[in-house]
Structure formats: structure tokens, C-alpha cells
Amino acid sequence: LPKAAKKKGGTAMFLARVEGSVVATKKDEGLSGRKLLLVRPQLVDESDPARFRPGKNTIVAVDSVGAGEGELVLFTQGSSARLAPNMKSAPVDAVVVGIVDTVDALGQVIYDAKTDGQA
């Protein structure tokens, strides 16, 4: 993730697309009963700020909001992830904390869930 996103003292949230789910039958007790999602960060494209470009890596994140495959979501990482409800004692580094309805960048809607994708 960008170095600016790793500042101390603040809670950073990121956008990601849900690409699938992860099933682990043997796992830490703190993950028992939790849905795991495979998410790919989405970045505003520097060459065309009206579009997203996918990040290079995927991340396994605990789902706290009932997100589904293909949805654009908000996720948080690190100590901020453990601030999500019922995550304080769970061994998590990334948690999906919201499902995105719209994204506006530079005065232009670049994502609208109603049209299922980029505006």
C-alpha cells in the first residue's frame, strides 16, 4: 500500500473489489464462524482519474458487512482492522467494513453500484 496510507495515529480505509471467498476448515479459533473474502485493492488511475485500476496483490479480509463477489468495498488494515465490531481479539489484519454505493473523484462520479461498475 502507499506509504502515505501507513501514517501513525490515523485510521486508513481503502477501496477493493471482492474477487472471491476463502474457505479454511482448520484455522485459529478467533476466525471460527467468520467469512473470509479475497479482495483486490482498487486505485484511482493517475493517467485517467475517472477510472480505477486494480492493485497488483490480493488480500484476504474478514467480512463484517455481508459483501459479495464483484462488489466494491471499503476495507481497513492493521490495528484499525481490530477496531471493527467483534474483532478485538481476532487475529486479523484486514477487515471489510463497508459496501460502496458511489465514488466521486474530482467532481465526477467514477463508480455507481446501481450501474454495477464504473460510471
Q: Model-derived features: where do they sit?
A:
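Short, Lys/Arg-enriched N-terminal segments with co-localized hydrophobic residues
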Residues: 1-12
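Short, surface-exposed secondary-structure boundary micro-motifs
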Residues: 21, 42, 78-79
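Short aromatic-glycine-enriched beta-strand elements
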Residues: 31-39
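Short, structured beta-strand/loop micro-motifs enriched in basic residues and often containing a Trp
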Residues: 51-59
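C-terminal structural segments of small proteins and small subunits
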Residues: 80-118
